[in-house]
């Protein structure tokens, strides 16, 4: 978690949920504009079980529309040549599996398009992990990026990205309410 002082109190930021929101909005913005894909140095072949291969066939066009360059490769494999640049740090196999696997949290995404559901699953895997140590610069960048989001208070699954503690609440907790 990141603790950040605001003008009238303190914000506790869940770095995973915040980064998930940031990545989600960047990918949706790219999907609605010019998609930037990162070509892989070498195409990656990923073997899929029958149900994932079926999911791939059903979602192939969606994957293409969000920045993947992917095609069937034999009976039980796919070949990935590019991934969305926003998630270029994520393992290619993990990105594909995140896109294709069903997630229990998808039920919270009823109003979202299939593209946004897939993007949400990918961002969940691509986001900074809870407990991961971030440098001060990384924390500051995360906070700035979150401030620029359209919906900075929740991740795409609806969990809060931050908790606000007012100066009055802090003063009460420290027994200083009447001492000002």
Where are these regions (language model features)?
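Long, charged low-complexity intrinsically disordered regions
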Residues: 1-180
């Amino acid at each position: 978690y990141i603790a950040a002082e605001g003008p009238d109190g303190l914000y506790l930021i869940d770095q995973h949920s915040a980064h998930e929101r940031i990545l989600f909005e960047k990918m949706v913005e790219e999907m609605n504009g010019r998609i930037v894909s990162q070509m892989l140095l070498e195409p990656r072949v990923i073997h899929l079980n029958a149900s994932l291969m079926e999911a791939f066939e059903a979602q192939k066009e969606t994957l293409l529309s969000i920045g993947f360059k992917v095609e069937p490769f034999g009976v039980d494999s796919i070949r990935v040549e590019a991934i969305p640049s926003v998630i270029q740090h994520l393992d290619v196999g993990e990105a594909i599996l995140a896109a294709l696997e069903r997630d229990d949290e998808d039920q919270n995404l009823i109003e979202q398009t299939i593209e946004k559901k897939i993007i949400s699953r990918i961002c969940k895997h691509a986001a900074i992990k809870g407990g991961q140590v971030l440098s001060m610069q990384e924390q500051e960048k995360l906070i700035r990026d979150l401030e620029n989001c359209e919906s900075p208070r929740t991740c795409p699954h609806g969990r809060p990205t931050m908790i606000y503690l007012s100066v009055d609440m802090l003063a009460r907790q420290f027994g200083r309410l009447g001492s000002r």
